[in-house]
């Protein structure tokens, strides 16, 4: 039986609880695993809610089920229902005015991250083994970091987004969460059937100090932890500690006309990364408008505070003469990052610029945090490269994470490296934080 509206007994993670059973076979690769589905994936016969009651009210039940949901079921997993998300996928915060904010299991009183908030919470609270989300600007990576779990944003375009409500197709990426690497690997082999990559050691690991300075405080010492872990597990000779901002400035010439706009920030920032973020958000806004302006203008939906202003700004934005420049920067950036990482290089960066903000944080400090977050999130976002957020544990009662990024299509290599490095990361974090 379906139950609408997640109760707080499930940490407020679920929109609707129901069972979608797999085929009756114990030989399937995901047999015995349960999963939850972000309320952005179509399920035949059910209305896809997209985080907003007016959207649900004005849309018919889906005619077909998302291929990625079908793939998980066909591989033996059992779905336990759909999860709450931020309205129209236009937030990385995780708060929903209409359905309630899912409770962050590892940091109550802090936001769970969005827009795949319920999917992350369902995994972190041990309600399911894995869950499906989407990531346009950070909506898998951020909730994973805030909830202390693994989150994979695959290479853009490699997992079908058919029968998934679009936010901005240029960046929309289906991803997934798990509590452990074994499950993450099992799910990835099913949902991302790329050729196996047997390489487990990177040829280079770039750990840019300027990206870690965006944190504003190095108290969690993740920069030292990742450097020590790579040197110990692999070889210090493969460490590359260049500044990513300088690399971008030198290799993405089209950012020149925008760079001065971001050179006077009082926030901890990297101007070149601020431009990359500006470009991605501009392109995202343009595509969101093309997808949803007609519905917003016709229905005039009830939208939550903060998010309402962001959506209406996107809808009201004119044809931006900078879009051609933005596309040029996107192409140059992807090419430059590919040249940096080559086939088997890794980029290590913070997933987010600090601990999860408190629920109900005031708008100004929250916007500052968002700006710094997108400087980091736009690296994989604009390039389309794959990224996995790795939980390092709790520091002062709050979750800490780090991310590894690899070139487009190197998803299985990326997971190989995570599997090789993870225990060393945990050991180094434990040792560093206890000293």
Swiss-Prot record:
Dependence of activity on temperature: Optimum temperature is 27 degrees Celsius.
Location in or out of the cell: Cytoplasm; Nucleus, Nucleoplasm
Active site: 38, 115, 139
Domain of life: Eukaryota
Annotated transmembrane regions: none
EC numbers: 3.5.1.4
One Pfam family matching this protein: Amidase
Keywords annotated in UniProt: Auxin biosynthesis, Cytoplasm, Hydrolase, Nucleus
Record field: pH dependence: Optimum pH is 7.5.
GO CC terms in record: cytoplasm; nucleoplasm
Catalytic activity as recorded in UniProt: a monocarboxylic acid amide + H2O = a monocarboxylate + NH4(+)
Annotated InterPro entries: Amidase_CS (IPR020556), Amidase_dom (IPR023631), AS_sf (IPR036928)
A single GO BP: auxin biosynthetic process
GO terms assigned for molecular function: amidase activity
Family label: Belongs to the amidase family.
Function: Amidase involved in auxin biosynthesis. Converts indole-3-acetamide (IAM) to indole-3-acetate, and phenyl-2-acetamide (PAM) to phenyl-2-acetate. Substrate preference is PAM > IAM.
Protein name: Amidase 1
